[in-house]
Amino acid sequence: MKSSEIREKFLKFFESKGHTIVASSPLVPGNDPTLMFTNSGMVQFKDVFLGEDKRPYVRATSVQACLRAGGKHNDLENVGYTARHHTFFEMLGNWSFGDYFKRDALMWSWELLTKVYGLPGDKLLATVYIEDQEAYDIWTKEIGLPPERVIRIGDNKGGRYKSDNFWMMADTGPCGPCSEIFYDHGPHIAGGPPGSPDEDGDRYIEIWNNVFMQFDMAEDGTVKPLPAPCVDTGMGLERLAAILQGVHSNYEIDTFAALIKAAGRETNTKDLTNNSLKVIADHIRATAFLVADGVIPSNEGRGYVQRRIIRRAIRHGYKLGQKKPFFHKLVKDLVEQMGEAYPKLQADAQRITEVLKAEEERFFETLANGMEILDAALAGGVKVLPGEVAFKLHDTFGFPLDLSADVCREAGVSVDEAGFAAAMEKQKAAGRAAGKFKMERAVEYTGAGNVFTGYENLQEDATVVGLYFEGTAVQQLKEGQAGIVVLDTTPFYAESGGQVGDQGFVSAEGVQFGVEDTQKIKADVYGHHGVQTQGTLKVGDKVQAAVDGARRAATMRNHSVTHIMHKALREVLGEHVQQKGSLVDAEKTRFDFAHNAPVTHEQILEIEKRVNAEILANSDTQARVMDIESAQKTGAMMLFGEKYGETVRVLDIGSSRELCGGTHVSRTGDIGLFKVVGESGVAAGVRRIEAITGANALSYFQDLEATVHSAAATLKSPPAELQPRLAQVLDQVKTLEREINALKGKLASSQGDELLSQAVEIKGIKVLAAKLENADAGTLRTTMDTLKDKLKTAAIVLAAVNDGKVSLIAGVTADATGKVKAGELVNFVAQQVGGKGGGRADMAQAGGTDASGLPAALQGVAAWVAERA
């Protein structure tokens, strides 16, 4: 049974049991700082289990793309070398949110495995938590699994409820027993059943885990029943496919077999059992899906994990003899295997290929040199690679530590990781010393959330419900003190979604607090940061909160145009454009987006044309609040990987429709004018556009016009005729430059003739060292050519001094380079004038900063040549 059939049968089975099919969420969890990557199917439902989110369904099923390559799941060195270690894998799952429980979950598991997939029941066994009699009875009495094949697992991890069969989301909160289903590969495979001393063998392989969240664990370790128990299950697709396809290793299943064959093709490797091919096949899945989900190789966070995986794959290709970029060519093979199940992979194939190719080209520039250093370090029979060598490979040649460790492991050598960490910390300490900063203490607020009225009003009557000084709650702020004010109602927008927080004033009679920024303390609690400029502000005071209207209006213009620009970027550059970050304030909008090449001038003009056309249309802006499902049906653009609540705000502005909680203009015409003022790259595969609107855009054009008028006046030309006048001036400049060069040639010839008489003959070589007056580098070279031609066998040094800096050139005729080298000669002189240089044996150049040493240096040339001739 193909992997595609396994996916399809799983989803259809649970759909027939009343489950809603939910699409795989991105590998980057939305708004979850505790996770680097989505590592299980339940991640996208975490807030549902915690009671912080509601869904329009109580039963769900999905096939979730997962990644484990960091933190406690960092088994990267095992990937490709064992039968079941992967970076990327797929998790089949079904969930109940307070609906069905143990009986249905286990009965359906058995039905799917034995009836739909056709696994023999006598090859399956299960584990249950030792105190979970209910699950034990379901297995033995209702499903009919013999008691000897239902294994009770106790607290085997050193504490109460610390067990392989008791699941906890965290130290406190939802938890409960679980029941795992294992497949017996047969007695010809080494290993014992779960719970036995030999359980780590490969005979019994876990394929499905049913977690029953029925308790709430308190801090003291006691548990009480949850009001609505839930079910969370997960089954690894690759493990199930291996069983259904009659193979023992996951790397032998259909999808991996195709990718391994492709890796062999691109590396010219015929032995398809080579572990390096398995590494490459695994890593193309992980890296391609990461790019599709917006993770670009970089030197920090998720981007660095991506870089580590890519470079590990490249190194294994290099090990197989591939010395040119190859890895990116596997994307098309991956799309053939998984594109139907994951349409985004197919849609983004070209961009994925380009990103991987760019990273390959970058690493191949340093890979060979780095491998030479690493091979040399290992050649002496060392047992441990020094930490400073590992750090040099990391810092200079881009070798992640685990890549160096991989190479060392193959040679039976360990890495001094402590030494590496010390070298890394030394570099970080230097960086910290160069740019120290002070971080505010976190503010803790336990009161009710505030009401935000800033969509409709810029002023609001409010009550002070919280005050903070240096991060600590206080009852009052005195004049001159900096602090944070919390109000029960506020028109101030708190920084979110790239839009900066509002500024303004909180005031009462004889009292004023200047708001310099507004930040969220919690999702629904806004902190007004600023300084008490007059009187004393107290908790409980009745105040008026007033936003700086001009600043808000300018910020709204820039935020609104960002939406229209985003749409124009996708239209002009392609649908692959994804927002990677933004900053919207009163001065400008700064928008980072996924794109592999600089945006051309012509493309910028087209983007400006489209955006300004939307502004001129002066259409109404419409904001609607609706549930997330309805919003999706409207076709509103959702930021990939962003986490949205049960209700969202859909913003229609011009022809753009996005989810956004920011503040915006009422009509597109309120934006006034749009101009792109900057385009640059901020990381591999990420571009940045900066743009201005309204009065700032008008000022930009007025300044530009003033510059044009000034230039026209200087050139005595009407502004409209400035371009042809400039062309005329440039032609005149070129003519003058040609005349100057001709004069320099005559001067060089004249000076050369004068210098001929100064040459002295030393052992058959005519030696000349002289300083030329008013000569530039070009004149020195021209004069050198003239002298070499006339002196025949010669060694010559010419010098010039301009603005206190010394320019040197040394020339040796071809018949004399066997005795005298121009590079050595010019360095001899340069060292005496505070400089250095180099070049070919017949011609070399140098510079210096100490002109006072030049006479003696030139005088010493004859003796230097005499020693070598």
Curated annotation (Swiss-Prot):
EC number assigned by the record:
6.1.1.7
Question: Cellular location of this protein?
Answer: Cytoplasm
GO CC terms: cytosol
Residue numbers binding Zn(2+): 559, 563, 660, 664
Superkingdom: Bacteria
Q: Which GO terms describe its molecular function?
A: alanine-tRNA ligase activity; aminoacyl-tRNA deacylase activity; ATP binding; tRNA binding; zinc ion binding
- What is the enzyme's main class? ligase
Annotated TM spans: none
InterPro entries cross-referenced by the UniProt entry: aa-tRNA-synth_II/BPL/LPL (IPR045864), Ala-tRNA-lgiase_IIc (IPR002318), Ala-tRNA-ligase_IIc_anticod-bd (IPR018162), Ala-tRNA-synth_IIc_core (IPR018165), Ala-tRNA-synth_IIc_N (IPR018164), Ala-tRNA_ligase (IPR050058), Ala_tRNA_ligase_euk/bac (IPR023033), DHHA1_dom (IPR003156)
Keyword tags: Aminoacyl-tRNA synthetase, ATP-binding, Cytoplasm, Ligase, Metal-binding, Nucleotide-binding, Protein biosynthesis, RNA-binding, tRNA-binding, Zinc
Reaction catalysed? tRNA(Ala) + L-alanine + ATP = L-alanyl-tRNA(Ala) + AMP + diphosphate
Its main localization is cytoplasm
Give the family, as the similarity comment puts it: Belongs to the class-II aminoacyl-tRNA synthetase family.
Q: Quote the function comment for this protein.
A: Catalyzes the attachment of alanine to tRNA(Ala) in a two-step reaction: alanine is first activated by ATP to form Ala-AMP and then transferred to the acceptor end of tRNA(Ala). Also edits incorrectly charged Ser-tRNA(Ala) and Gly-tRNA(Ala) via its editing domain.
* Free-text comment on this protein's domains from its UniProt entry: Consists of three domains; the N-terminal catalytic domain, the editing domain and the C-terminal C-Ala domain. The editing domain removes incorrectly charged amino acids, while the C-Ala domain, along with tRNA(Ala), serves as a bridge to cooperatively bring together the editing and aminoacylation centers thus stimulating deacylation of misacylated tRNAs.
Know the name of this protein? Alanine--tRNA ligase
- Organism of derivation: Herminiimonas arsenicoxydans
